[in-house]
């Protein structure tokens, strides 16, 4: 699954925090 597709992208993308 794509990190941007998940409900919590911030959990997959640390830089998104």
From Swiss-Prot:
The keyword Disulfide bond applies. GO terms for molecular function: toxin activity. Belongs to the disintegrin-like family. This is RK peptide. Its main location: secreted. GO terms for cellular component: extracellular region. Keywords: Cell adhesion impairing toxin, Disulfide bond, Secreted, Toxin. Venom protein with disintegrin activity. Interacts with both alpha-1/beta-1 (ITGA1/ITGB1) and alpha-v/beta-3 (ITGAV/ITGB3) with a more pronounced effect for alpha-1/beta-1 (ITGA1/ITGB1). Inhibits the cell adhesion of the human glioblastoma cell line U87 and the melanoma cell line IGR39 to fibrinogen and fibronectin. Also inhibits cell adhesion of the rat pheochromocytoma cell line PC12 to type IV collagen. Negative results: does not affect the viability of U87, IGR-39 and PC12 cell lines at 100 uM after 24, 48 or 72 hours incubation time. Does not inhibit cell adhesion of the human glioblastoma cell line U87 and the melanoma cell line IGR39 to collagen IV or laminin. In vivo, does not show toxicity on mice by intracerebroventricular injection.
């Amino acid at each position: 699954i794509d990190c941007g597709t998940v409900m919590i992208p911030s959990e997959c993308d640390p830089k998104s925090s």
